[in-house]
C-alpha cells in the first residue's frame, strides 16, 4: 500500500488535508470522504486501499473543521460547504498526473453520500457518483428540535458577544443524538470510535441549525448525464432503506443502479466479511460507465 499525505485549497481559503492512494497507471480516480463529524481514519481507509489495488487512484480527505483539515470552529458541519469542497477536491484530482480528468468518481458515505449526490448534480465534470448508505431523512424529534434551535439562537447572540461556540455531544450515552436527529446508534460499534485519538464526540450546536436548513432533495432532479449508484444496507437502522430508496427514485438520470445489500447495517456495509462482494459491484459499475 502506497499512501501520500496531500493537501488542497478551497475557494474560500481553507486547506483540506487527506491521503492519496495512487494507482499504478494514469486512469480513473475516486474522491472520497466520511460522514457527519467523522474523520477519515474511520472505516474508509480499507475501502480506499481496496480500490487502489484495483488500479484506481483514491483521494480520501477530512471534511472542513474535522481531523487534519482547516476550519473553525472545530467539529462544525455546514452541508452546503461540504458540497463546495467536493468540487474543489475534484479540481485538485483533475490536475494530478495519475488521473484521467474525465473519469473522476465522487464517493460519499453516510452524511457525505448525500453531499456527493448534490455535488454530482451541480458539477458536470463528475464522471459518476457512488452514494453509500446516505442519510436520507432530516427530520428532528419535535421536543429536541425546539430545544436545540433555541440553544442555537442563544449561541449566535453569545458568539456576537465574543464567546466561544456552544457544543453538544454527537451521540449521547443512550445512543441517540441529543438534538433529536435520526435513529439510535449501535453503542457497541460507536464505542470503538470513542476509544480512538482522532474522533471527537461533540459538534457545534450550529451544525444542527445548518442541517435543518439543508434541503438536498430538490437537487436530486439536477442529476442528469452522470451515472449514479446507491448502496443501501437492508438492515440500516440509522437511515431507513425506504428513505434511501425514495431519494434514489427522485434522480432522473437513467444510468442509475440501486444495490440493496442483504444482512448489512449502516456501519458494516462496506467493511468486514462479505464486503468485497459489495465493492466488486461498485467497481463493475465504474468500469461499465467510465470504460476502463
Curated annotation (Swiss-Prot):
Ranges for the region named Abhydrolase domain are 46-267
Catalysis performed (reactions): fumagillol + dodecapentaneoyl-[polyketide synthase] = prefumagillin + holo-[polyketide synthase]
What is the top-level taxon of the source organism?
Answer: Eukaryota
Q: Which GO terms describe its biological process?
A: fumagillin biosynthetic process; terpenoid biosynthetic process
Enzyme class of the recorded protein, top EC level: transferase
Gene3D superfamilies linked: 1.10.10.800, alpha/beta hydrolase (3.40.50.1820)
Give the Enzyme Commission number.
2.3.1.-
A Pfam family it matches: Hydrolase_4
What is the documented function of this protein? Polyketide transferase; part of the gene cluster that mediates the biosynthesis of fumagillin, a meroterpenoid that has numerous biological activities including irreversible inhibition of human type 2 methionine aminopeptidase (METAP2). Within the pathway, the polyketide transferase af380 catalyzes the transfer of a dodecapentaenoyl group synthesized by the polyketide synthase af370 onto 5R-hydroxy-seco-sesquiterpene to produce prefumagillin.
Positions the record marks as coiled coil are none
InterPro entries associated with the record? AB_hydrolase_fold (IPR029058), Hydrolase_4 (IPR022742), Polyketide_trans_af380 (IPR051411)
Phenotype seen when the gene is deleted: Completely abolishes the production of fumagillin.
Instruction: Describe its applied uses.
Output: Fumagillin and its derivatives have been intensely studied for their potential use in the treatment of amebiasis, microsporidiosis and rheumatoid arthritis. They have also interesting antiangiogenic properties by the irreversible inhibition of human type 2 methionine aminopeptidase (METAP2).
Give the matching SUPFAM superfamilies: alpha/beta-Hydrolases (SSF53474)
This protein's pathway reads: Secondary metabolite biosynthesis; terpenoid biosynthesis
- One function term, GO molecular function aspect: hydrolase activity
The similarity annotation says: Belongs to the polyketide transferase af380 family.
| Conditions for induction | Expression is controlled by the fumagillin biosynthesis cluster regulator fumR. Expression is also under the control of the developmental and secondary metabolism regulator veA.
Q: What is this protein called?
A: Polyketide transferase af380
Going by the UniProt record, its keywords in alphabetical order are:
Transferase
Amino acid at each position: 500500500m502506497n499512501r501520500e499525505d496531500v493537501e488542497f485549497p478551497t475557494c474560500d481559503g481553507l486547506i483540506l488535508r487527506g491521503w492519496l492512494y495512487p494507482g499504478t497507471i494514469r486512469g480513473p480516480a475516486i474522491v472520497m470522504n466520511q460522514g457527519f463529524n467523522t474523520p477519515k481514519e474511520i472505516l474508509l481507509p480499507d475501502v480506499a486501499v481496496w480500490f487502489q489495488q484495483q488500479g484506481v487512484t483514491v483521494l480520501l480527505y477530512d471534511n472542513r473543521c474535522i481531523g487534519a483539515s482547516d476550519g473553525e470552529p472545530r467539529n462544525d458541519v455546514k452541508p452546503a460547504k461540504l458540497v463546495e469542497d467536493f468540487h474543489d477536491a475534484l479540481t485538485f484530482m483533475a490536475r494530478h498526473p495519475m488521473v484521467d480528468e474525465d473519469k473522476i468518481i465522487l464517493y460519499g458515505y453516510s452524511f457525505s453520500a448525500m453531499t456527493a449526490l448534490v455535488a454530482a448534480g451541480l458539477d458536470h465534470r463528475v464522471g459518476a457518483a457512488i452514494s453509500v448508505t446516505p442519510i436520507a431523512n432530516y427530520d428532528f424529534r419535535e421536543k429536541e428540535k425546539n430545544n436545540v434551535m433555541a440553544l442555537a439562537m442563544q449561541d449566535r447572540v453569545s458568539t456576537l458577544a465574543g464567546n466561544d461556540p456552544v457544543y453538544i455531544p454527537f451521540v449521547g450515552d443512550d445512543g441517540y443524538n441529543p438534538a433529536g436527529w435520526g435513529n439510535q446508534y449501535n453503542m457497541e460499534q460507536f464505542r470503538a470510535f470513542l476509544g480512538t485519538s482522532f474522533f471527537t464526540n461533540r459538534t457545534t450546536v450550529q451544525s444542527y441549525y445548518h442541517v435543518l436548513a439543508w434541503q438536498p432533495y430538490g437537487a436530486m432532479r439536477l442529476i442528469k448525464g452522470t451515472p449514479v449508484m446507491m448502496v443501501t444496507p437492508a438492515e440500516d437502522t440509522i437511515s431507513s432503506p425506504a428513505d434511501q430508496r425514495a431519494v434514489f427514485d427522485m434522480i432522473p438520470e437513467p444510468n442509475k443502479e440501486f444495490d440493496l445489500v442483504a444482512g448489512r447495517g449502516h456501519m458494516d456495509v462496506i467493511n468486514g466479511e462479505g464486503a468485497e462482494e459489495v465493492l466488486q459491484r461498485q467497481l463493475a459499475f465504474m468500469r461499465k460507465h467510465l470504460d476502463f
